[in-house]
């Protein structure tokens, strides 16, 4: 991990490894450059190469050689993007980010040939790129990028451990503070307060409550309700806190103010046994 930054950042050696691997894949696919597209909810490939978690929209121009350029929206997001990113050349994307990226390709002499496209690009933006680069062949490189990201480095595993630790904090807070008389909205507050001050961010906090002896839900809800928790309820959870894009995940049920019913205890015991059996699956096993 890079220790001289105000924000979490991987080491220069880690980014060098990523760039080398990605460029080897580009060469194999015959690509001169990549256009890596990201938005607030879908930005993993942009962050993987730039360290910047996209706040609205961003396009990374990533050439086969030379320095990349990161275009971000909005104008007032540029100063922070320059602090967070490992990319030296960070610019505002102007009125249309795709137009700025296309112009950058022209300046580099990369407006023709095969260009890799990474990410889920809205039709309007794709049509703009297609129309502005009639001599270029646009090739979807998303799957290849995702394949490269599947195998985590030692530094990434440390970030995942941090995400897991933050997720554990959330569950521990629920164990302490979940009680009859509070609402599901208050459960969300308990969860987030456990990790926000530690540099964590919310990834998901799905939760639901229901009477154990007369249940009406069987899975955590994606949106909390104003239901007031009662004695004899079960709280079911799916919690993922993230550390700079690297989340943990933990699922735990809680019996509120009473012992678990026979049915819920049986389901819990089966879940624990299933989880423990994962340890017997050897590396390299397939889904069969």
Question: What are these language model-derived features?
Answer:
Residues 1-288:
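Active-site neighborhoods and metal-handling regions in enzymes and metal-associated proteins
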């Amino acid at each position: 991990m890079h220790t001289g930054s105000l924000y979490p950042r991987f080491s220069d050696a880690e980014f060098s490894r990523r760039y080398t691997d990605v460029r080897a894949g580009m060469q194999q696919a015959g690509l001169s450059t990549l256009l890596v597209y990201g938005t607030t909810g879908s930005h993993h490939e942009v962050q993987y190469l730039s360290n910047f978690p996209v706040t609205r929209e961003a396009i990374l121009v990533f050439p086969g050689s030379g320095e990349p350029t990161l275009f971000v929206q909005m104008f007032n997001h540029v100063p922070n993007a320059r602090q967070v990113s490992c990319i030296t050349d960070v610019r505002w994307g102007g009125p249309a980010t795709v137009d700025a990226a296309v112009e950058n390709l022209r300046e580099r002499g990369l407006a023709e040939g095969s260009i890799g496209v990474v990410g889920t690009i809205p039709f309007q933006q794709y049509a703009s790129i297609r129309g502005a680069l009639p001599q270029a062949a646009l090739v979807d490189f998303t799957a290849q990028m995702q394949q490269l990201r599947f195998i985590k480095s030692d530094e990434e595993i440390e970030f995942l451990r941090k995400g897991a630790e933050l997720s554990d904090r959330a569950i521990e807070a629920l164990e302490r503070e979940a009680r009859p008389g509070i609402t599901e909205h208050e459960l969300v507050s308990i969860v987030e307060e456990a990790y926000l001050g530690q540099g964590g961010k919310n990834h998901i906090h799905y939760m639901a409550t229901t009477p154990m002896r007369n249940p009406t839900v069987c899975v955590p809800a994606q949106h909390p309700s104003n239901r007031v928790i009662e004695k004899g309820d079960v709280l079911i959870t799916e919690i993922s806190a993230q550390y700079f894009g690297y989340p943990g995940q933990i699922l735990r049920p809680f019996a509120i103010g009473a012992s678990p019913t026979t049915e819920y205890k049986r389901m819990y015991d089966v879940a624990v046994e299933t989880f423990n059996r994962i340890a017997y699956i050897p590396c390299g096993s397939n889904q069969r």
